[in-house]
Amino acid sequence: MSVTLSRKLIDYVKLAKPKVVSLLDVVAIASYILAFKGNWYNLIPVLIGGSIAAGGSMIINGGLEIEKDKVMKRTSWRPTVKGEVGRKEAYMVGGIACALGSLIGLLANPLTAFFILLGSLVYVFVYSYYLKPRTWLNIVIGGFAGSAAAWAGYAAASNSFNLESLLLGLLVFAWTPGHFWALALRYKRDYANAEIPMLPAIVDDKTAARAIAISNILMIPFALGLMLYLNLIYVIITLAATAVLLYFNVRLMRNPTPEESWISYKFSAPYLAIVMIAAVISFIL
């Protein structure tokens, strides 16, 4: 019995995409610190609740996309594809996790719980269920799911939603398309075979590479908008990180290969973490 339970837990963790959740946690922590009002206790429920709810959303996503995951080499290993976690089981476990995570958020305040729940609802219903199989705008609009992590973290510390909080969320929103389009270009054939209309799967490689670069350029005003609240340290670190990101994007435009798109993708996740850490350093100093 213990072996079976252990196996199940491992399957759920795989479906929960811990790397994605950990990046959302970085966003939530940074947002919490930027809104810090002298109370560290609320960081615990927003981190635990947000992580559980985000993981639950990913598990539901695994149940929704079994057929598509089967034809994609990148996702063919998932427990839902192998039959180790059934569709209804994924819905049930994921749904419970989303509800539990939102309830834990209440230990901070109702606004935190609202944003945790909002993130789950946007990811599951708006992005995964409705937009992803229908339009290339899927990840553009779906980026608001990540924004909710910033808003939840900020709300947990301050019980408020203001311009600074909005900018943090919009930064994550604007970062999302370029990040996931780089991944989709790397696995373009997978997405095409699964009939998922990610932008790189429905346009030529050069157009996709330009779209990635343009998306990241459009992100810059949101990143620099935080200058209203932070000092020169944030500006210097953010500009340096952005220069590196755009350098990889230029390389990708010149040579739109799977290898170059993978390099852009692999840097874009640390990029967001770097910007968030820069914001924290700037705030503290």
UniProtKB/Swiss-Prot annotation:
Entry annotated with the keyword Cell membrane: yes
Cellular component per GO, a single term: plasma membrane
Pfam families in alphabetical order: UbiA
Keyword presence, Phosphoprotein: no
Membrane topology: Multi-pass membrane protein
Biological role: Converts heme B (protoheme IX) to heme O by substitution of the vinyl group on carbon 2 of heme B porphyrin ring with a hydroxyethyl farnesyl side group.
Misc: Carbon 2 of the heme B porphyrin ring is defined according to the Fischer nomenclature.
Name of the featured protein: Protoheme IX farnesyltransferase
Organism: Sulfolobus acidocaldarius (strain ATCC 33909 / DSM 639 / JCM 8929 / NBRC 15157 / NCIMB 11770)
Taxonomic lineage from the root: Archaea, Thermoproteota, Thermoprotei, Sulfolobales, Sulfolobaceae
